[in-house]
UniProtKB/Swiss-Prot annotation:
Component of the RIX1 complex required for processing of ITS2 sequences from 35S pre-rRNA. GO terms for cellular component: nucleus; rixosome complex. InterPro entries: ARM-type_fold, Ipi1_N. The keyword rRNA processing applies. This is Pre-rRNA-processing protein ipi1. Component of the RIX1 complex, composed of ipi1, rix1/ipi2 and ipi3 in a 1:2:2 stoichiometry. The complex interacts (via rix1) with mdn1 (via its hexameric AAA ATPase ring) and the pre-60S ribosome particles. SUPFAM superfamilies: ARM repeat. GO terms for biological process: rRNA processing. Disulfide bonds: none annotated. Pfam families: Ipi1_N (PF12333).
Length: 348
């Protein structure tokens, strides 16, 4: 009897509800597994969680490296967009995070980039750089600009003209007076437009405006390539041949008596003021020479380019439309820049 009553009591345990008492926790099940854990830190691979954010200089350097070396078009464009935003949002009187001498050598090769968005974003960034810092770097900038002007792709040639236009706005005097800035750039214009003189017949030719094996249809597929080229050429010739308004104003000796030509004896305001003398550099040819004076630029232009340009302008006027209007602007620049050239002192 005792054993059977005990067995019945044990069976009833499985079906009895446990009464909870105040102040006592519920009993844990027999198959309970403790899943709680304690951790003092969380480690995430390839990430660094710090209390202080990187400085503007560090961020600028990082994105500058991405813009200049990344193989992804999207990444280069986004990096340039970040750099543009950072420059445009900083105070006017605050210096840029990195010197222009460090920025330009890294970004100038992007003038020849195959992606149109990258080139467009590059031009927006270049326009935010301090104009005073561009003059001493014009020579290196023109190397890539001239390469873009004679590129096989039409879009790159058009964007290279926009870069040259920006250079003329911020440092026009340096563009036309730096080594190779006058003759080599004019040769690039002549090759790009197709105004060339045949060496065999010594006759001006623009048969199909062919350059590097490209037909006129491909060269001007946008319909506005030639007018754009003529307008930028007008700006370039105006910077090199036309006297500034301040210099063209007549002055009387009474205004400056007893001091004459004071500005010629002042301390030069530009770096390497005697670079045109080429005292210690390698010998230069006519194309790589520096033409500081307006008279020298007039002489070289008259000797090598004026006849072809005048003939090309006359042909462009016959096309009427935008090309004709651009040719009229170029004609006015030629008249203002060369009307006082006599060629008497041309001994070369």
């Amino acid at each position: 009897m005792g054993s059977s009553a005990r067995k019945k009591k044990e069976k009833k345990k499985d079906f009895q509800k446990t009464k909870l008492r105040v102040g006592k926790t519920k009993a844990k099940a027999d198959n309970f597994t403790d899943t709680s854990f304690k951790s003092k830190s969380i480690v995430v691979n390839q990430q660094s969680l710090t209390t202080s954010a990187p400085s503007n200089v560090v961020q600028f350097t990082h994105y500058l490296s991405l813009a200049s070396s990344s193989k992804s078009d999207t990444q280069r464009k986004d990096a340039l967009s970040f750099l543009t935003t950072q420059l445009s949002s900083q105070p006017v009187n605050e210096a840029i995070p990195l010197p222009t001498a460090v920025i330009l050598p890294k970004l100038l090769p992007l003038i020849l980039d195959g992606n149109a968005s990258v080139r467009s974003q590059l031009l927006k960034f270049l326009r935010l750089l301090p104009p005073a810092d561009i003059g001493d770097r014009v020579e290196s900038a023109l190397l890539y600009t001239r390469a873009g002007m004679t590129h096989l792709a039409t879009e790159i040639r058009v964007d290279a003209l926009a870069v040259l236009e920006w250079l003329l706005q911020v440092a026009g005097d340096d563009v036309v007076s730096c080594p190779g800035g006058w003759v080599k750039t004019l040769k690039s214009f002549m090759s790009m437009i197709g105004w060339t003189t045949s060496s065999a017949t010594s006759k001006w030719s623009s048969a199909s405006r062919v350059s590097f094996g490209i037909s006129r249809a491909s060269f001007e597929k946008s319909g506005k390539t030639l007018p754009r080229q003529l307008l930028v050429l007008s700006q370039f010739l105006k910077a090199g041949l036309v006297e500034p308004d301040t210099a063209a104003q007549p002055t009387t000796s009474d205004n400056h008596f007893p001091l004459f030509d004071v500005e010629r004896h002042m301390i030069p305001s530009r770096a390497n003021a005697y670079a045109h003398l080429n005292l210690f550099g390698s010998s230069r040819d006519e194309e790589g020479e520096m033409y500081i004076d307006r008279e020298d630029r007039q002489r070289v232009f008259h000797k090598r380019f004026q006849a072809d340009v005048v003939t090309g302008v006359e042909h462009a006027k016959r096309e009427a439309g935008e090309a004709g209007r651009a040719a009229a602007v170029l004609t006015k620049v030629l008249r203002d820049g060369m009307n006082d050239y006599s060629g008497v002192d041309d001994t070369q």
